[in-house]
A protein has these predicted regions:
Chain A
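Onset of an N-terminal alpha helix
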Residues: 3-7, 44-51
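N-terminal secretory signal peptides and thylakoid transit peptides that target proteins
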Residues: 1-17
Length: 241, 592
């Protein structure tokens, strides 16, 4: 299938008209280029591109935005810079041992250092995830999800995958005040009306509840939430051709 | 230097449901009460308002209302041949902290034990012969349903419980739970509204010959003035219930139901941000002299008291006993000792029901205790002959937690991420309900709590160590009850697919990672025999008569029900005996 990777990239680009006139290889180099100009709080550009590539395999674009289009990379960046990423809520006293899966998180890393070190080791040497074609990116994520064939030193592979996947879902579906779920993308997709919740008159009715989502910082009349997460950032991570 | 304060009558460790109930009852009885709570002050009126409280990331994922493992956690292993490691992150259970304890972020599923549950050993032995209990530490509670009933009823009136009585003074009532013990009075409030999936479950369960009823709920359905004169308001089905505080005054919690009516009492004093380190004992070791705690500035303080009440939650009560040398620690090698013995949990399984587009479940409309339940397979409500297990569980279609980050039901065989996952989440979110099997948990000699030899908490104290796996008995029970739930699911109308999950499935070990329930029980159990219980039938420690113990640590084994109704029944029973007997004449209330 000589054309497969090009086709995959075109699919990946989705509705972007530019895709038809730009060669696939060049596209791959520029994928997520906009991320380079972001004023990151924790991530650097290459980490952001890795996370965007991985997030968009986990939640790809269809009729609804992909993870990165919905601001998931911004969300992850802010989370890793904040208390959660820095280890709040994690008991990190030693001694450390691998433990069983039933014993849960046993690495000495904070989530932020787990992800930083994990990405560095995954990207060490070989082709960067962002440069793989869609098929290979999926295969990579598939292997990572099973923990197969990686040795990341003191970064447990399964924990790394689980943590990133949890963050991606959180970024896609949490209130937009945290920088993800941009324009209520995740909530629109499933039909969740948001934080303003009063259902006494409807709960026993077998009928849809077609209310547009409203977040905690909803701006009346706009269909949007105020960008309280990072007012300086106008644009979220977006794939560009 | 430890600062010593003037003596008080009663010191109470913990300001949750049991601690505030103790303070209210004992303050009214003329006892000067000091309540010591390690967490922050907070209030429904000022801290839990919508929309800010409706923040799933902050409260349901980052768990801001719950304990912080950096200051309080335990170590865990499945069996004593493993090395226990710290539970570094919250998961399987979510103990509370702060005013109201876990009572502010509970669901409000408010149950009573069955009469037979409270005499589990003698009941099963009589009906099936002793052999059915081989290898199990199943025990009688030493207190009967009839003795607890007035106190269970009182707690219903503290919470304004919504439900349909199934047994009113011995008379079976239509629409209620026909298996329950006799109630002396009806529920204070009518049941919750039933959502479409609950209506379908009810219809099918009825057709199959079962006895569905609306789950008893402390999400109040009408404006209600409780037994203490506090005011509650109707639930809005807001869907941000368990893990969240209720800003609508609709979920009965210890702050609005009890704290507000005791806070100005001359006999009540509350000290927040204060961590009790240990209970101090007299020179002869027979009584407690008070508690030592770290005050809000981190200074060590000794609070002397005539009577000590442990209301720190099941796990932390046991921890306090172990670090203070109260009672005799359990030794799994010899079977001797009682503190830490009979730790049990809750055995959960569930069937997921995927409807076609005709049925709108709208899972974001929900409440912590919105459920349609059958009790036909709980306790000994069914014949256990030749089943190979004791106990059971209720089966309930629940509409409680359909929030967008955590709730992504997908039919069996859907990939767990990627395009097909995304499509399946989109198509099923509004058309799904979960049917929970909320199973009992027997006590066995190998499941217990003690102190960890290696790991220490922020105060330099050894962590509590939990050794637990699902006993074979409960694996068989869970598989059986789940098969019944699955049958109901498949018989329901408009069902496209059914999925199942069983936390106690054969071959799988208990894990502290996925949330199951905050129903940790046992470790300081109630009874009439000091060799198998830590407290006598009045909740008084056998070894130290001025220490009274509250909470689910008292359960000799866990019920198929949520614990708060039963443990509050026990709390008011203990308080009754303290007020009307012990405090006039402090002494052991039973001979050892
Ligand atoms: C998400 C969730 C849902 C639940 N849903 C239900 C339900 O639907 N039905 C049901 O029956 N039960 C439910 N529960 C369980 C219920 O919350 C508990 O049974 C109940 O709160 C126990 O009350 P308690 O007074 O024993 O302990 P808690 O409410 O936990 O209060 C104990 C207090 O003691 C304090 N404390 C502990 N140690 C110390 C110390 N050393 N020094 C000072 N203070 C200390 C803690 O900070 C805490 O505030 C749920 C729990 C959770 C977390
Ligand atoms: S569902 Fe009802 S009881 Fe629960 S938090 Fe919302 S309003 Fe309160």
């Amino acid at each position: 299938m000589p054309n497969f990777s090009r086709r995959a990239v075109l699919l990946q680009i989705g509705a972007s008209g530019l895709a038809a006139v730009t060669p696939g290889a060049a596209l791959a180099q520029n994928r997520y280029a906009a991320l380079d100009t972001q004023p990151w709080s924790y991530l650097d550009g290459s980490e952001a591109r890795f996370l965007a590539s991985m997030a968009d395999v986990l939640i790809p674009e269809d009729d609804f935005p992909s993870a990165s289009q919905a601001g998931v990379v911004d969300f992850i960046d802010l989370q890793l810079a904040g208390p959660y990423g820095q280890g709040a809520g994690l008991f990190l006293e030693g001694p450390f041992a691998d433990g069983t899966p039933e014993q849960g998180w046993q690495t000495a890393h904070t989530p932020a250092s787990l992800i930083r070190n994990g990405i560095a080791r995954l990207e060490d040497g070989g082709t960067r995830l962002v440069d793989l074609d869609a098929n290979d990116r999926s295969a990579f994520v598939e292997r990572l999800s099973k923990g197969e064939g990686f040795d990341l030193g003191d970064v447990p592979v399964q924990t790394l995958f689980d943590e990133i996947w949890a963050l991606v879902k959180e970024g896609y579906f949490s209130d937009p005040i945290y920088g993800g779920n941009k324009d209520y993308a995740g909530w629109e997709m499933i039909g969740f009306p948001g934080a303003h919740a009063y259902y006494t008159d409807h709960v026993d009715k077998n009928a849809p509840f077609p209310a547009p989502p409203k977040g905690i910082a909803h701006v009346p009349g706009t269909g949007r939430s105020a960008d309280t997460a990072r007012p300086l950032r106008a644009q979220t991570a977006r794939e560009e051709g | 230097m430890v600062r010593e304060l003037p003596k008080t009558d009663v010191v109470i460790v913990g300001a949750g449901w049991t601690g505030l109930a103790a303070a209210k009852e004992l303050a009214d009885a003329g006892q000067r009460c000091v309540v010591i709570e390690r967490g922050d002050w907070r209030h429904d009126a000022s801290n839990f308002g919508a929309p800010e409280e409706h923040d799933e990331l902050k409260y349901a994922r980052r768990k801001e209302h719950m304990i912080d493992t950096q200051t309080k956690t335990l170590s865990f292993r499945n069996s004593s041949d493993q090395t226990a490691l710290p539970m570094r992150r919250l998961g399987s259970f979510l103990p509370g902290k702060g005013l109201g304890g876990a009572g502010i972020h509970w669901n409000g599923q408010l149950w009573r034990p069955l009469p037979s549950d409270l005499k589990m050993r003698s009941h099963y032995a009589d009906r099936y012969g002793e052999a059915i209990l081989d290898g199990l530490n199943v025990q009688d509670w030493g207190v009967t349903y009839d003795e607890l009933e007035p106190h269970l009823d009182f707690f219903d009136r503290v919470c304004g419980t919504a439900g349909v009585a199934g047994n009113l003074n011995g008379e079976t009532k239509e629409g209620g739970n026909p298996f329950e013990g006799p109630r002396s009075a009806d529920y204070p409030n009518p049941p919750m509204k039933a959502s479409p999936p609950l209506q379908l479950f009810q219809k099918t369960a009825q057709e199959m010959g079962y006895h569905p009823f609306q789950m008893p709920s402390a999400n109040v359905t009408k404006a209600y003035e409780n037994a203490y004169g506090a005011q509650l308001h109707p639930c809005t089905y807001c869907g941000f219930c368990e893990r969240f505080g209720c800003g609508y005054y609709a979920k009965a919690d210890p702050i609005i139901c009890i704290y507000d009516v005791v806070k100005d009492h001359e006999n009540f004093e509350l000290r927040m941000n204060s961590q009790v380190l240990r209970v101090e004992k007299s020179a002869d070791g027979k009584t407690a002299t008070g508690v030592t705690y770290l005050d809000e500035r981190g200074q060590e303080v000794f609070q002397p008291a005539d009577t000590v009440c442990l209301n720190a939650y099941a796990l932390w009560n046991v921890h306090l006993m172990l670090v203070s040398g109260l009672g005799k620690p359990y030794d799994p090698e010899t079977g001797e000792g009682t503190v830490g013995r009979n730790y049990a949990y809750q055995t959960l399984a569930a069937a997921g029901v995927f409807f076609d587009k005709e049925v709108w479940s709208n899972p974001f409309m929900g409440a912590g205790a919105l459920g349609m339940t059958i009790d036909d397979f709980n306790g000994d409500n069914f014949d256990h002959t030749d089943l190979g297990f004791v106990g059971g569980g209720y089966i309930s279609a629940n509409q409680t937690n359909g929030r967008p980050i955590n709730y992504h039901p997908t039919p069996p065989d859907t990939p767990s991420w990627g395009p097909e996952w995304k499509k399946a989440v989109r198509e099923n979110y509004l058309h799904h309900v979960g049917i929970v099997c909320h199973g009992s948990s027997v006590a066995v000699p190998g499941n217990y709590l003690d102190l960890d030899p290696t790991y220490k908490d922020a105060y330099g104290q050894p962590l509590l160590r939990m050794t637990f796996d699902f006993p074979e008995n409960d694996r068989r029970m869970s598989a059986y009850v789940l098969s019944k739930a699955e049958e109901i699911a498949r018989n329901m109308d408009n069902v496209r697919a059914v999925s199942t999950v069983n936390r106690a499935a054969e071959g799988e070990s208990y894990s502290v990672v996925p949330y199951q329930t905050t129903h940790n029980t046992g470790g300081a159990v109630i009874g009439t025999d000091p060799t198998t219980s830590v407290v006598n039938r009045y909740g008084q420690m056998w070894d130290h008569h001025n220490v009274f113990v509250f909470g689910a640590c008292l359960f000799p084994q866990n019920l198929g029900y949520n614990p708060t109704g039963p443990l509050m029944g026990l709390a008011y029973w203990t308080l009754d005996h303290m007020k009307n007997d012990y405090l006039q004449n402090p002494r052991p209330l039973m001979d050892a």
